[in-house]
């Protein structure tokens, strides 16, 4: 049993293990649990549970049998029947070794293994089950989500269908609209075609009209010619008539003698007989009839010779005249003036000639008791063409005078006879205009009077010129073109006539007649004296309103309706003449040329006077010749148009027409008693004021119907500005000076309304009520302020008028002044302390009124004008100082003064809810809106009653302004980081430059801000690198991102907004506007990439050297390791080298190498041993035994020109080229030890030479280095100064580039041209040592408005730098030959007299032609600074008189500018092509001849030398003692520089073209010498001047001598062999610009052959 049990145990224990293992292996191999479905998983789970149950049963069974098995194993081993068990026992019991494994498997261990495996399987199955459950849950959730997504998909699909339907409808609508719009477009196109057709028609019509106009002009010219011809005929006829008149006078004298004889005979006959007297009377009557006939003939003749009349000295008996036509002058409100004290005709008239022809036979017509009427002038002056009357009847009238011809009584200053027609509104007063008539006249009024009344040569209103006799009238055509001018001058003349007319008439001689002058403008009155005529009155039309003249303090009132004049002749019975007043009235619209002369024969003749509809006033005029006062012409009415808020002025509705009857008293009898009226108390006042005593009754009660009382007369006098009448009325007792008419207008109101300051002063001194208001509540101050009479306003304010008085509508004087744009009145009222916030009934304030008119000045005054302290008011300039510029271009007044008006007043709304900003924005008054926006309290979002903001009602311009209202202006600056110390030549380079100001609005996004910054930088780079003066606006259209200097937005290293770093494209949470406000960023700084980043952008911007060239230099250093920079002194070599070293150092450090810069300054004492120590100590020279280090060394050798290159670098040339241990070089140290060294591969050697070219032995060093030549006439030096100074100007103007015509631009251009012209002249003089780089000119001061600062700086630069260098170079050249080896020329310590003269001449020529030429300062101002320049006062005649008579035969007299560098690659100085082997001698001749024909630099001395060789030249010992050929060449070149261009017309030396000069030194061997001149400088087109006579002679002589033949060309300096080839063709391009020639040269100058031997002769070109 035991054996069976023991033997069966393994089988029972293996069974479940094998089953479980097989199941697991099958599960692993056949399927994956993750891929089972739910049902399969359930089945698998049931299988697992069954296995677990079976396992539990096995375990229980084994436990039950365990005891048996234990006993069996323990005690059954001694069974001898089983040897296997015995062997097992022995094995286990033997040796006690625990590590021995049993021979057979223990069932218990098998069971334990099975149990462990089952546990593992259980754990794995439970884990898989949990994973399956979680996946099941996820699956369920995904199914739910899928269902939700499907439902949402269905909804979206439905919505999509709906949207598609809607879109279809929209598309259909759009298609319809497109069709409609296309139809409209077609219609508009058709309309446009029609309009264009109409436009073409209009153009054709316009052209036709122009042609007609030209034809009319030609016609008028022809008519004028005809008139001139007729006038000449008239002159001839006048002379004939004068001769006839002389004959008649002689005949009359004979007749008088005959009469005397007859009288004597009669007396004798009386004695002899009593029956003969009856026969003498008919004879006498017959004689008188003869005289009458002769005078009648004169009347007819007078009409035909109207235009030519001389000054007449009347005889004493010329008082008798025929009836004549007497014009009634339309002088409104002008006082009448009687005859002059010297007689009825002023014989001292210097301004105007009397219109009276010489007549001698009219003294017997009228008796001497009749008032003397001067004869009508022999003028036929007709303002509007010929009159319509026929030949006058000598018995009835003389030829009727036109409206403005000379009056019959007295000659007026404004009435020049013949053609100087008087202004129609002028009064009739004395022509003399002497001081006796105007004792108290204002000189300004007198001057104005003479201006408008015509002096001896001033044109009158018809365009004629008042000249000394004989003068002529112009044609009617020319008069018609001057109507407007005539009206304007009439108005001013009328205004001046009131004050220029005498107020106190001098007593005239008895018999001088009084004169009546009435009428208005433009009606023209005519008065004719007839034998049996009755006065007749016609009513005229209202006159036009003249322009308002608020500026004249004494401006009279506007013209008024005319006074009707009835001249009563009832008391002139003994004269037999009557006065008929005929007023020919024309409406204002009718032109003056429409007036015509009415013949008096057509006037009705009645026995009784025809009275006008209104009562007349009988003016009894005294015969004493006293001046008639202004009462005779005082008129009321015709007020100017009422201003807004003001009603019509006083008496405008019922303007009084005052008919006046002027009675001409007979002879000189006193006034009859019947004509006198009571009231003699007024006679003194009347007489004292210049009135005739006979006017006194008029003032009391005279006439059929008097005026409406004294107060009305007072108002009329005040309204018209009649100070005389007003003062007289104010002296009366009991007169109510505060009387008001129906409208409530007082006399003070009328005077203030019309701007009569004197009347206002009189009324105020008479204590008139200053605040009396009319029926609308307007006071005199309101009226004066509305009309702009600031003097009246000032006077009323001084008399304490109520400045805040409000009318019935609430209008204050300030409001009315603002409403009518009266700036002076506003200023006076504000200074008086008026209230600015008074509102009208409509809610309008003065601010509303000022904005409504769009007057910026008024608004500025209201907002900024303060009440001055201590009575000092702002002057007008202060109140308007600064333009309110949003761009901040000028300093605005609010930067100095703050607004004085509160925010409530600015934001006050009227009845409609509109503020002042609403009004300004709606009317498009951008300037007014801008000023309002400057006020900090403005509320632009305030809405009106229609819920509209200011932006809603604004125009487009104003909307743009409002959108920029709160825009921040942040200056944008460019910084280049730290500027190196001045040792590197960067002391004039600026660290920061302001390029523009950015507008940052509230709605500006960060993207817009980034684009603005990038665009501003791009525009700035393009502007400073352009050829001309560009503004930022000019370059915005340029789409290129890179500028000419290579900078762009990519050159930016970093940007700081205030102190916050920012990069392009970066965005913050806040908008740029909020960000700037919050961080208080005052500027935006752009830092360019510099050497620290391994870039050269900052170096480019600081030095203005193009980035491409700097990168090229850096590439040369990195590639060749040995580079030397050379150029004229001041070419920034040190700065360039140091910046390249910094950039190279940082690049090497970025690559992981350590780098060091070693700098050494070379001087004359720097030895080769010191240089060796420098190389060794800096680890640049390494011993052969030593291993190289990874450290990079950059060695800079500065100022190599101070030492000899060949001596200093000779031993280092070979190892520098071959840097390796294979080519070592042995150097001996100072201690005597020698050692082999080699140059490290990582060593960079850079040097600087301040010399334009190498010479002598230094050329041996040239091939071992890479050379960078910084030529002054090539890039980068050529444009560096221009770019630098332009950037300086832009920075000075805060980013705004000024216009090219700005004085700053001109002075900067001048400084630039000085540098270029100076170098051009120095190069031409062959003194390359004196050439200057741009460094010295970088410090040019830019001070706007002070060009003198730049000139003073230039004088210091000239005296301190330029002149000493030029002096040294000239002495070096003129004293000794150039010495090879050291490279420098030494001048004599004690120059000779001739050398000193050459130096002075050179300095003088350079100063005048290169420095002072082109200076924009005025000549007088420049002369003051010329003395500051030393060397400018040398007589250039010494130079021009010098001649090269001591030159050796066969040598050339001219010499050239030099460049001796054989490795030069750019032919800036050279010509495009060189020697051609196939050039024939004949070709050279032709070219030479053509060149000489165009030679502009030929001098007179050369011409003389060509003609006379040595015979006519000056002895050198007498003038200049010059010892060498170079010295003679120098003087020759100075001659050519100052010849052919006069000192007064200095042109640019830079334009001197390549010359080919010939000198006849030997008989048939003329020498050709070519001068290489600079072709880079700009030239002016007006520089090409014709040859003078001397030059022409020289050309012809040279031509004849050239044909003799060409032997050879000799040159002492290295010159391209084919220099001769292109001389003539270059001269043909005399008018082309230098830029064009530069391009041609640069394109063709790559291949050059240079002669390096100084004394080698060039063979003939055809050899």
Swiss-Prot record:
Residues 1-23, 203-222, 358-440, 454-479, 499-616, 1446-1477, 1580-1602, 1618-1663 are annotated as: Disordered. The modification Asymmetric dimethylarginine is found at residue 498. The modification Phosphoserine is found at residue 1524. Residues 1645-1663 have a biased composition (Basic and acidic residues). Keywords: ANK repeat, Cell projection, Coiled coil, Cytoplasm, Methylation, Phosphoprotein, Repeat, Synapse. ANK repeats lie at residues 709-739, 743-772, 776-805, 809-838, 842-871, 912-942. Residues 386-396, 1624-1638 have a biased composition (Low complexity). PROSITE patterns: ANK_REP_REGION, ANK_REPEAT. Residues 411-422, 583-593, 1582-1599 have a biased composition (Polar residues). This is Cortactin-binding protein 2.
């Amino acid at each position: 049993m035991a054996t069976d049990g023991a033997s069966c145990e393994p089988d029972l224990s293996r069974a479940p293990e094998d089953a479980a293992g097989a199941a697991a292996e099958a599960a692993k191999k056949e399927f994956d649990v993750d891929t089972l479905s739910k049902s399969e998983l359930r089945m698998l789970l049931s299988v697992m549970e069954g296995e677990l149950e079976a396992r539990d049963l096995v375990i229980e069974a084994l436990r039950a049998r365990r005891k048996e098995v234990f006993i069996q194993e323990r005690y059954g081993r001694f069974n001898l029947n089983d040897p296997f068990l015995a062997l097992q026992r022995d094995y286990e019991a033997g040796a006690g070794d625990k590590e021995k494994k049993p021979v057979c498997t223990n069932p218990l261990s098998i069971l334990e293994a099975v149990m462990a495996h089952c546990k593992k399987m259980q754990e794995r199955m439970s884990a898989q089950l949990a994973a399956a459950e979680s996946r099941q849950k996820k699956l369920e959730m995904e199914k739910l989500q899928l269902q939700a997504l499907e439902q949402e998909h269905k909804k979206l699909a439905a919505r999509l269908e709906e949207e598609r339907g809607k879109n279809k409808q929209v598309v259909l609508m759009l298609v319809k609209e497109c069709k409609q719009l296309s139809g409209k477009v077609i219609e508009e196109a058709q309309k446009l075609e029609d309009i264009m057709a109409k436009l073409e028609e209009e153009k054709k019509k316009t052209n036709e009209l122009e042609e007609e106009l030209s034809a009319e002009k030609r016609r008028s010219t022809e008519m004028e010619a005809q008139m001139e011809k007729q006038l000449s005929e008239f002159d001839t006829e006048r002379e004939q008539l004068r001769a006839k008149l002389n004959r008649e006078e002689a005949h009359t004298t004979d007749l008088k003698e005959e009469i005397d004889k007859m009288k004597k005979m009669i007396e004798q006959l009386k004695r002899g007989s009593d029956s003969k007297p009856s026969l003498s009377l008919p004879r006498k009557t017959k004689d008188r009839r003869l005289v009458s006939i002769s005078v009648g003939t004169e009347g007819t003749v007078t009409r035909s010779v109207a235009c030519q009349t001389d000054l007449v000295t009347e005889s004493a008996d010329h008082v008798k005249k025929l009836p004549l036509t007497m014009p009634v002058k339309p002088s409104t409100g002008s006082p009448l003036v009687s005859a002059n004290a010297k007689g009825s005709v002023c014989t001292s008239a210097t301004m105007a000639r009397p219109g009276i022809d010489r007549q001698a036979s009219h003294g017997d017509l009228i008796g001497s008791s009749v008032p003397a009427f001067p004869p009508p002038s022999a003028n036929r002056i007709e303002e509007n063409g010929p009159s319509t009357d026929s030949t006058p009847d000598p018995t009835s009238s003389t030829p009727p005078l036109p409206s403005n011809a000379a009056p019959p009584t007295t000659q007026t200053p404004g009435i020049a006879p013949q053609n100087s027609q008087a202004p129609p509104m002028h009064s009739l007063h004395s022509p003399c205009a002497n001081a006796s008539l105007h004792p108290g006249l204002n000189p300004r009024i007198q001057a104005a009077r003479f201006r408008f009344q015509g002096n001896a040569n001033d044109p009158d209103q018809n365009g004629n010129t008042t000249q000394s006799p004989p003068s002529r009238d112009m044609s009617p055509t020319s008069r018609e073109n001057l109507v407007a001018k005539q009206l304007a001058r009439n108005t001013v003349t009328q205004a001046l006539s009131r004050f220029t007319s005498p107020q106190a008439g001098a007593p005239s001689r008895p018999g001088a007649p009084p004169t009546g002058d009435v009428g208005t403008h433009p009606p023209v009155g005519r008065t004719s004296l007839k034998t049996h005529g009755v006065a007749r009155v016609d009513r005229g039309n209202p006159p036009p309103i003249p322009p308002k003249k608020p500026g004249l303090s004494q401006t009279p009132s506007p013209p008024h309706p005319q006074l009707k004049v009835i001249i009563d002749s009832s008391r002139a019975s003994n004269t037999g003449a009557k006065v008929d007043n005929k007023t020919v009235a024309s409406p204002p619209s009718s032109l003056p040329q429409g007036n015509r002369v009415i013949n008096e024969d057509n006037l009705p003749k009645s026995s009784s006077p025809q009275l006008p509809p209104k009562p007349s006033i009988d003016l009894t005029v005294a015969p004493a010749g006293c001046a008639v006062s202004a009462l005779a012409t005082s008129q009321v009415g015709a007020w100017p148009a009422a201003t807004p808020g003001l009603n019509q002025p006083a008496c405008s509705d019922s303007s009084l027409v005052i008919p006046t009857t002027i009675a001409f008293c007979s002879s000189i009898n006193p006034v009859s008693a019947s004509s006198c009226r009571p009231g003699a108390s007024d006679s003194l006042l009347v007489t004292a004021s210049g009135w005739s005593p006979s006017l006194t009754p008029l003032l009391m009660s005279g006439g059929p119907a008097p005026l409406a009382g004294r107060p009305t007369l007072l108002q009329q006098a005040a309204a018209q500005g009649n100070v005389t009448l007003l003062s007289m009325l104010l002296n009366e007792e009991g007169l109510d000076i505060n009387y008001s008419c129906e409208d409530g207008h007082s006399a003070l109101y009328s005077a203030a309304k019309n701007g009569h300051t004197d009347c206002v002063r009189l009324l105020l001194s008479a204590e008139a009520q200053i605040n009396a208001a009319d029926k609308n509540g307007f006071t005199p101050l309101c009226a004066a302020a509305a009309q702009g009479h600031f003097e009246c306003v000032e006077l009323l304010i001084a008399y304490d008028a109520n400045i805040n008085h409000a009318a019935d509508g609430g209008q204050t004087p300030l409001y009315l002044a603002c409403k009518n744009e009266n700036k002076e009145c506003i200023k006076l009222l504000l200074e008086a302390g008026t209230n600015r916030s008074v509102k009208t009934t409509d809610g309008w304030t003065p601010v509303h009124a000022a904005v409504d008119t769009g007057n910026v000045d008024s608004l500025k005054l209201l907002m900024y004008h303060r009440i001055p302290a201590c009575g000092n008011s702002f002057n007008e300039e202060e109140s308007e100082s600064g333009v309110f510029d949003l761009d901040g271009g000028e300093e605005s007044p609010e930067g100095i003064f703050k607004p004085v008006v509160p925010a409530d007043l600015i934001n006050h709304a009227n009845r409609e809810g509109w503020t002042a900003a609403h009004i300004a924005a709606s009317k498009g008054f951008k300037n007014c809106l801008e000023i309002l926006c400057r006020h900090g309290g403005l509320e632009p979002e305030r809405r009106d009653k229609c819920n509209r903001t200011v932006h809603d009602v604004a125009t487009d311009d104003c909307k743009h302004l409002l959108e920029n209202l709160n825009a921040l202006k942040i200056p944008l600056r460019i910084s280049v980081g730290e500027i190196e110390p001045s040792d590197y030549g960067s002391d004039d380079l600026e660290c920061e430059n302001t390029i523009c100001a950015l507008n940052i609005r509230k709605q500006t996004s960060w993207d817009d801000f980034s684009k603005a910054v990038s665009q501003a930088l791009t525009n700035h780079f393009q502007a400073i690198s352009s050829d001309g003066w560009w503004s930022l606006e000019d370059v915005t259209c340029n789409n290129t991102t890179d500028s000419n200097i290579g900078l762009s937005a990519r050159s930016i290293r970093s940007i700081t907004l205030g102190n916050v770093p920012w990069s392009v494209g970066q965005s913050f949470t806040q908008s740029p506007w909020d960000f700037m406000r919050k961080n208080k960023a005052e500027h935006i700084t752009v830092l360019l990439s510099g050497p620290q980043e391994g870039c050269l952008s900052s170096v480019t911007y600081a030095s203005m050297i193009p980035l491409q060239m700097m990168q090229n230099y850096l590439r040369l250093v990195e590639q060749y390791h040995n580079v030397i920079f050379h150029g004229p002194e001041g070419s920034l070599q040190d700065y360039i080298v140091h910046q390249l070293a910094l950039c190279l150092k940082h690049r090497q450090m970025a690559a992981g190498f350590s780098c060091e810069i070693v700098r050494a300054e070379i001087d004359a004492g720097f030895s080769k041993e010191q240089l060796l120590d420098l190389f060794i100590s800096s680890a640049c020279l390494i011993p052969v035994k030593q291993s190289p280090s990874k450290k990079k060394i950059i060695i800079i050798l500065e100022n190599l020109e101070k030492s000899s290159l060949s001596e200093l670098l000779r031993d280092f040339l070979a190892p520098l080229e071959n840097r390796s241990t294979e080519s070592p070089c042995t150097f001996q140290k100072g201690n005597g030890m020698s050692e082999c060294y080699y140059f490290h591969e990582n060593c960079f050697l850079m040097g600087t030479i301040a010399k334009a070219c190498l010479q002598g032995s230094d050329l041996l060093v040239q091939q071992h280095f890479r050379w960078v030549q910084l030529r002054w006439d090539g890039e980068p030096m050529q444009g560096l100064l221009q770019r630098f100074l332009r950037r300086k100007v832009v920075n000075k103007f805060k980013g705004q580039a000024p216009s090219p015509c700005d004085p700053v631009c001109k002075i900067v251009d001048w400084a630039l041209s000085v540098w270029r012209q100076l170098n051009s002249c120095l190069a031409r003089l062959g003194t390359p040592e004196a050439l200057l780089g741009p460094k010295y000119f970088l410090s040019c001061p830019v001070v706007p408005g002070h060009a003198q600062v730049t000139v003073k700086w230039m004088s210091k630069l000239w005296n301190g730098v330029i002149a000493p260098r030029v002096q040294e170079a000239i002495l070096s050249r003129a004293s000794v030959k150039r010495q090879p080896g050291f490279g420098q020329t030494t001048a004599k310590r004690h120059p000779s007299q001739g050398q000193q003269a050459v130096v002075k001449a050179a300095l003088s020529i350079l100063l005048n032609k290169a420095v002072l030429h082109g200076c924009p300062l005025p000549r007088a101002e420049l002369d003051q600074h010329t003395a500051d320049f030393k060397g400018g006062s040398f007589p250039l005649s010494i130079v021009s008189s010098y001649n090269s008579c001591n030159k050796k035969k066969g040598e050339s007299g001219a010499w050239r500018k030099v460049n001796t560098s054989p490795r030069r690659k750019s032919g800036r100085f050279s010509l495009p092509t060189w020697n051609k082997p196939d050039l024939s001698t004949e070709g050279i001749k032709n070219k030479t001849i053509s060149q000489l024909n165009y030679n502009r630099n030929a001098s007179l001395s050369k011409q003389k030398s060509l003609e006379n060789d040595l015979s006519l030249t000056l002895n050198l010992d007498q003038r200049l003692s010059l010892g060498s050929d170079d010295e003679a060449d120098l003087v020759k070149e100075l001659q050519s520089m100052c010849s052919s261009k006069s000192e007064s017309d200095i042109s640019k030396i830079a334009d001197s073209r390549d010359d080919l000069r010939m000198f006849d030194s030997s008989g048939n061997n003329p020498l050709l010498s070519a001068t290489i001149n600079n072709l880079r400088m700009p030239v002016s087109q007006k520089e090409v001047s014709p040859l003078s006579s001397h030059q022409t002679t020289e050309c012809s002589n040279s031509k004849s001598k050239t044909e003799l033949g060409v032997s050879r060309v000799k040159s002492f300096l290295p010159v391209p062999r084919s220099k001769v080839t292109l001389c003539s063709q270059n001269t043909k391009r005399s008018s082309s610009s230098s830029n064009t020639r530069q391009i041609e040269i640069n394109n063709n100058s790559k291949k050059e052959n240079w002669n390096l031997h100084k004394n080698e002769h060039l063979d003939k070109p055809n050899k």
